[in-house]
């Protein structure tokens, strides 16, 4: 009995999307006899790699991190923005036990509910729709005092665009009949991440003491005064919002504070100022004992406070499932995409699983990859072919970075050269897989090189696309392709080709049915 394994190989051609139109399309311009032949003669289909199908907002372009997480997880993995959008749409947000408990504690004690966050439609650190939903939640649970502390954007949105958002919040408060905007300040102060604690202190004092450099009777008036001082949204100085006869919105013991940013990096510092007992960033004039301080997502593992949406741990990703079944696997790529075939493909797990080997090929040391479009693909292919021939691995996951890394340069001829280099590599890998009696899937994590010019502006298109990506089967099994697939169907497809059971956590479906 032979102990030599017949591997199943997943080759991810990074940034290799599918586009019918040949205009400004480096993939169709390239001479690719091998990929052309495989596409014509082997079972194939197109799969989605962007938008809702990978857990991103509708029509948003895919990216390598999200792509590899979905590839390895075998299920759609919702990004925080989309996860919250879905929760609000399905109304489960309004029953979130952490958010409701915080509001209920404040209501029971007759205290205030404070909401703070980046008040914009930017969708990078937060979204105004989530804040509007939080106001609604607090009002529905009987909160009488609801105070919004609006951090203004101007980075992920145009520099002077906050007025529309502030008007939305004012309208929501009018609709629910309680609460108001209590302060405005630019994200430059409230969301610093470079230990410039003097900035954070200004935001902290504004919220805890209701003291700022300026005061205005309403938020729009405060914003317009800032513009008159030549402060764009990002740099608006601490402004207390308080109409005539309105009570102070200073934070008091027993109040609840909910931080509505979902991205961690710029939320950590001000959160630590509120919750750390041994805080040393600046001398706090007032330390508030909140009934609850809630962070919307986990900003850091060492921040000890309530979290409404803890990170979803991904159980039984492809890598973990292989290890549980005592299978061997190899992850191989160049420096540029090594983290993607390891950490991201494993669902955010840094350590290799038992039986998982890794090979890192150094990417070339050039200023930009248009100067060496083949990158280190020859060495990568040599090592990959060696691994296939070794008979050591049940599964091999490989990423060729060229289509993406050279596509990002915007240099068309270089992208064509990159694609042609890949075709030569695929020829060698295909021969090795067939000689070993193995099987291979060729796909991509997102598009890039198929769209090298922006038709709207005429400028080089250096970003990813939201186009589908190819999926090709190479092997000796008689298989039938299933259309309508997505990246999260790849792991179940690999397991099916290996004759393995698919874990229940994987909701993706096999895209090649063995006949």
Swiss-Prot record:
- EC supergroup of this enzyme: isomerase
Record's signal peptide: none
- The residues that the entry says bind Mn(2+) 1 are 404, 408, 464
Entry's Gene Ontology molecular function annotations: manganese ion binding; phosphoglycerate mutase activity
Protein name as annotated: 2,3-bisphosphoglycerate-independent phosphoglycerate mutase
Q: How does it assemble?
A: Monomer.
NCBIfam families named among the record's database cross-references: pgm_bpd_ind (TIGR01307), PRK05434.1-5 (NF003897)
What pathway is this protein said to act in by its record? Carbohydrate degradation; glycolysis; pyruvate from D-glyceraldehyde 3-phosphate: step 3/5
Query: Family, per the entry?
Result: Belongs to the BPG-independent phosphoglycerate mutase family.
What keywords tag this UniProt record?
Glycolysis, Isomerase, Manganese, Metal-binding
For this chain's UniProt record, which GO biological process terms are given? Answer: glucose catabolic process; glycolytic process
Q: A single Pfam family, by name?
A: Metalloenzyme
Provide the residue positions that the database annotates as binding substrate: 125, 155-156, 187, 193, 263-266, 337
Cited function: Catalyzes the interconversion of 2-phosphoglycerate and 3-phosphoglycerate.
Cofactor binding mode and count: Binds 2 manganese ions per subunit.
**Active-site residues annotated for this sequence:** 64 (phosphoserine intermediate)
Reaction(s) catalysed (UniProt annotation)? (2R)-2-phosphoglycerate = (2R)-3-phosphoglycerate
Q: Which cofactor does it need?
A: Mn(2+)
The record lists Mn(2+) 2 as bound by 14, 64, 445-446
Gene Ontology cellular component annotations, sorted alphabetically = cytosol
- EC number assigned by the record: 5.4.2.12
